[in-house]
């Protein structure tokens, strides 16, 4: 919904003026900016008529910054200061970068997000991305003749909180007002759905330079409902380049490469990959700074063989997304191809074989995301009615809390439509407990140790009560950008604590896919472990309550009764050290049975105390 500003009488400034808004596809390899003109979404070109801006930034020794084509031209001669594919570093730590040995950059191992040492000093991926976005803003304002009111920035559907927040920070650093972070497959669906007036179930297969997403959507009467999403936030065209790069090293048997030679071979590898989209073979030549040369022919067949495992890595998440949506491949009406990497013949053939239909490619896969983002920006800026279509996007992984015993309590299940808010009540574990630690988790496993930790905060000021009496309501809120906020409120006093979840860095390579795979693989073991931990927590509570009662009212028992209860406690503690949750359950039942008489005497004694000195009619 667009926000309206109310002006003084006579001071209204063009209430029906078209507001300038854009959609930006901040890609691993290329970045594009688009807008809506006369009702049609168009990609904005630079002065040379080029729509694609290479996502490359160079920091020169003289302090100047090159972005796009000038930077790309320098990547072989100045590899240390020319940053390529910076999107792969967004929201990630140095330990998360698998191919770090082959990269020419000087990484700084700082806490949180990785940083890079350049001629202009240490730079974060947020700062580097901001330079790209700044140039996009300048291109748009020059082309549209005014200042932008805002932009919709697209992100991979599998970007986590840290990666999304890093993208938003980069946009704000570039002077952009972020109207919305929009998932790339959803943006593509907008462009295709409105362009083709389509209805039915569609798959959006999005393979970019550094990320892969698969989304299953239902399009019906202007409603874009994401049924399921899956993918890999560190799989893309760059990985195909790496396979060709390794093949080149085998062909040339070179001495250890300098940074500039490594960048040269990577560039040649990308050129060869792109040439194979149109030809059955390509000649690959290179001359290194050492004078070493290579001259070899790469065939489409060899390329397909060396990259087959990467293609397969895209199909595994596709199967999971279909399973989550409760659909078979033959129930999908069409497959939308997004991202420049989908031009590879091996990708198109694999998708066609999997879905048993020819994928849709009538929109440029490089431009379709930016076009959809521009359409959404036009709505959010208030230039057209928001009832033309409705976006129902989802979160990729469940969100929840750690409870006693190291268990995971899911509050928002994965594939829940966003924006959303869910609340759940929790209580204290110990008598007199006045504080609670809230540990926010992301993942599908039953134990907290197997899920990703997002944030921790404490709620203090809980009034001291017996265990289980306090009521703490924990509320999870996920906004339309997919960003999470969590609050905890003690119901009787109103004391509250909250946190905006901003982890220090994002999910590691394939973490989300791995977390989902582990959840399926270990489901039975996890359920057993959960049952065991639940019984241990219950046993701990019973033992603590029994010992407190013995300390207070042990005089109500004779020696034999006291010994029986102590034996029951000891037996239960021994069972708690074992792996059998059913045995612990039986031990709990046995101790409860042993203490039944003791509990009855305590109750009778307390009733007598309450009635002492009272008249009978008081209790009528």
Swiss-Prot record:
UniProt GO BP: iron-sulfur cluster assembly
Q: Which SUPFAM superfamilies match?
A: Actin-like ATPase domain, Heat shock protein 70kD (HSP70), C-terminal subdomain, Heat shock protein 70kD (HSP70), peptide-binding domain
- A GO molecular function held by the record: unfolded protein binding
What are the cysteine partners in each disulfide bond?
A: none
The record's section on CDD domains has: ASKHA_NBD_HSP70_HscA
Write out the entry's keywords from A to Z: ATP-binding, Chaperone, Nucleotide-binding
Any keyword ATP-binding? yes
| Family of this protein | Belongs to the heat shock protein 70 family.
The free-text function statement in the UniProt record for this protein reads:
Chaperone involved in the maturation of iron-sulfur cluster-containing proteins. Has a low intrinsic ATPase activity which is markedly stimulated by HscB.
Q: Which PANTHER family match?
A: HEAT SHOCK PROTEIN 70KDA
Per its record, how is this protein called by name? Chaperone protein HscA homolog
Upper lineage: Bacteria, Pseudomonadati, Pseudomonadota, Betaproteobacteria, Nitrosomonadales
């Amino acid at each position: 919904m667009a926000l309206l500003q109310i002006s003084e009488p006579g001071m209204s400034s063009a209430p029906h003026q078209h507001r300038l808004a854009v959609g930006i596809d901040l890609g691993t390899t290329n970045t594009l900016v688009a807008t809506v003109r006369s009702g049609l979404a168009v990609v904005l070109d630079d002065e040379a008529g080029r729509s694609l801006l290479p996502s490359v930034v160079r920091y020169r020794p003289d302090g100047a910054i090159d972005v796009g084509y000038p930077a790309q031209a320098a990547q072989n001669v100045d590899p240390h200061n020319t940053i390529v594919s910076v999107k792969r570093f967004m929201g990630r730590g140095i330990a998360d970068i698998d191919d770090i040995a082959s990269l020419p950059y000087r990484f700084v191992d700082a806490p949180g997000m990785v940083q890079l040492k350049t001629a202009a000093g240490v730079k974060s991926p947020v700062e580097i991305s901001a330079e790209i976005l700044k140039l996009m803003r300048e291109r748009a304002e020059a082309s549209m003749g005014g200042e932008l009111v805002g932009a919709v920035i697209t992100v991979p559907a599998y970007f986590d909180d840290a990666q999304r927040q890093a993208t938003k920070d980069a946009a704000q650093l570039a002077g952009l007002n972020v109207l919305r972070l929009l998932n790339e497959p959803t943006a593509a669906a907008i462009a295709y759905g409105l362009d083709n007036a389509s209805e039915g179930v569609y798959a959006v297969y999005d393979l970019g330079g550094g990320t892969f997403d698969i989304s299953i959507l239902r399009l019906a009467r202007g409603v874009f409902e994401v049924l399921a999403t899956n993918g890999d936030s560190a799989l893309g065209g760059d990985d195909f380049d790496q396979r060709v790069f390794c093949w080149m090293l085998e062909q040339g048997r070179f001495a250890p490469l300098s940074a500039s030679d490594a960048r040269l071979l990577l560039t040649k590898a990308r050129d060869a990959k792109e040439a194979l989209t149109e030809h059955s073979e390509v000649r690959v030549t290179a001359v290194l700074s050492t004078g070493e040369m290579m001259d070899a022919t790469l065939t489409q067949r060899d390329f397909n063989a060396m990259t087959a495992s990467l293609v397969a890595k895209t199909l595994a998440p596709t199967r999971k997304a279909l399973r989550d949506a409760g659909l078979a491949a033959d129930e999908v009406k069409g497959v939308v191809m997004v991202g420049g990497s989908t031009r590879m013949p091996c990708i198109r053939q694999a998708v066609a074989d999997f879905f048993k239909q020819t994928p849709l490619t009538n929109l440029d896969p490089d431009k379709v995301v930016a076009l959809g983002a521009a359409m959404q920006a036009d709505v959010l800026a208030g230039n057209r009615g928001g009832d033309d279509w409705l976006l129902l996007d989802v979160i990729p992984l469940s969100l929840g809390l750690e409870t006693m015993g190291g268990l995971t309590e899911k509050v928002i299940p994965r594939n829940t439509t966003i924006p959303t808010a869910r609340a759940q009540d929790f209580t204290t574990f110990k008598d007199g407990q006045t504080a609670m630690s809230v540990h926010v988790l992301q993942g599908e496993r039953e134990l907290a140790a197997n899920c990703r930790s997002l944030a921790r905060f404490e709620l203090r000021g809980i009034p001291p009560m017996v265990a289980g009496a306090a009521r703490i309501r924990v509320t999870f809120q996920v906004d339309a950008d997919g960003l999470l906020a969590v609050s905890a409120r003690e119901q009787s006093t109103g004391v509250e604590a909250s946190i905006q979840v901003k982890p220090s860095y994002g999910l590691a390579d394939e973490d989300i896919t791995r977390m989902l795979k582990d959840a399926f693989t270990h489901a039975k073991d996890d359920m057993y472990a959960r049952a065991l931990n639940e019984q241990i927590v219950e046993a701990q509570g019973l033992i603590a309550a029994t010992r407190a009662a013995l300390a207070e009212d042990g005089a109500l028992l004779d020696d034999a009764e006291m010994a029986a209860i102590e034996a029951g406690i000891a037996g239960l503690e021994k069972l708690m050290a074992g792996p059998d949750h059913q045995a612990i359950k039986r031990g709990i039942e046995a101790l409860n049975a042993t203490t039944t008489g003791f509990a009855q005497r305590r109750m009778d004694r307390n009733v007598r105390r309450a009635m002492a000195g009272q008249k009978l009619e008081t209790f009528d």
